[in-house]
């Protein structure tokens, strides 16, 4: 077979899996199989590979057309072939651990934080709180935190859904608003005459 008469094999590769999670590169999917020579009705041996196996597709509309190339073993008889295979790109999970330090009633409230975070660093985070046990959940405004009475509370954190990540609800943590100790000034130089009661003494 002369170079100008080389045959173009047809077909598509077999994928080791049809879906990946956002953050995974294309080369986490292995390509295998053979193409077919429709002229002679025989299978064509060769090697498949991704054009860019390090590429990390975004979720987009959920389907990504990934480009592959097939290099035939017999390059004198067959042409190199390229094509695309559709794969599903699924959203990835996010994670975070909420924490909140306790404080004393009457002092400035602590600020909740989210640590050990994975996912989209730009995803919106919403904090909320409730009295431990039976309180209704309410939004915690970091810029204008509520004035809470002494007691035990739960802090919640919610990471918002993004184009490539699912939202995440962090496990709540508990924090304590401690009772305050009243301040006072001990009176001095008090005097009383014999026969007076304490009620008669001016403070």
Predicted ranges, named:
Residues 1-203:
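Solvent-exposed beta-strand/loop surfaces, strongest in extracytoplasmic domains of secreted
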């Amino acid at each position: 077979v002369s170079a100008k008469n080389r045959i173009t094999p047809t077909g598509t590769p077999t994928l080791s899996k049809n879906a990946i999670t956002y953050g995974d590169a294309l080369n986490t999917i292995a390509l295998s199989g053979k193409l077919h020579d429709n002229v002679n009705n025989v299978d064509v041996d060769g090697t498949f590979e991704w054009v860019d196996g390090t590429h990390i597709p975004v979720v987009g509309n959920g389907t990504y057309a990934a480009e592959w190339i097939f290099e035939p073993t017999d390059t004198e008889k067959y042409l190199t072939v390229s094509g695309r295979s559709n794969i599903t790109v699924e959203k990835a999970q996010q994670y975070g651990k909420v924490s909140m330090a306790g404080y004393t009633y009457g002092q400035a409230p602590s600020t909740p934080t989210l640590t050990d975070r994975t996912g989209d660093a730009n995803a919106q985070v919403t904090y909320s709180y409730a009295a431990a046990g039976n309180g209704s959940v309410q939004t915690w405004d970091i810029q204008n935190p509520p004035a809470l009475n002494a007691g035990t509370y739960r802090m919640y954190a919610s990471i918002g859904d993004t184009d490539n990540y699912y939202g995440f609800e962090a496990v709540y943590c508990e924090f304590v608003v401690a009772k305050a100790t009243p301040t006072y000034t001990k009176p001095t130089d008090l005097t009383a005459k014999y026969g007076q009661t304490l009620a008669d003494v001016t403070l």
